[in-house]
Amino acid sequence: MGNIMDYLKWRGDLTFSQDAFNEVDNLLLSYVAYVNLEGLSVGAGEEQVTLEELSRRFFVLHSEEELAADKSFTRLAPYIVKMMAQSNRYRTSIISNYVNMVNPQLELQFSAVQLDLSDGSKNFCFRGTDDNIVAWKEDFNLGLGEVPAQKLASEYLNRFGAVSYTHLTLP
C-alpha cells in the first residue's frame, strides 16, 4: 500500500492546473503546520515566501543532528515538507501568517499557517494535538466545553480572509 511520500513521487510533477486539488493534497498541506517555523520570518505581518524557500531556510537553521535527535511523532514533518518543496505541485505555494502559541497556564496550544496555492486557492492549516502535555490537556478540555484555541482559530480565519471554518472553529 502506498503512502503520502509515494504520492509525492507519483504526482509531485503535476501542477494543480494539471491535476486538481484533492484529499491527499489536503493531508500533505497539514504537515506544514507541524513544522516549527519560528525564526523563518513568515509570521503574521512578516514575509511571504514560497514553500521551496521556506524549506531551504528551515534546513539552514536546523542541522541534521538536531532533527535526528527529535523523537516526537511529528519528526518526519520537515522531511515531508522538503519533498513537497522539491515538487512542481507545491514548490511555488506561498507560506505566510504563521502563528504559534503555547501557554501552559491557560492550557492553550494554537498554531496555524496560511498556504496560497498556484491554483489561486487559500489553505489554512492548523496544528492538532502533538506530543506535548499542553496539547493533551487541551484535548481533554474539549470534552468539557470551548477551549481558547477554538476562539483563536475563528479570529485567525476572520483576520486572514477564510470563508469557511474548520472543526476547531465551531462553537
Which residues does each predicted region cover?
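Conserved small/polar residues in nucleotide/adenosyl-binding loops
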Residues: 166-171
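Non-catalytic, mobile gating and regulatory segments of ester bond hydrolases
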Residues: 1-165
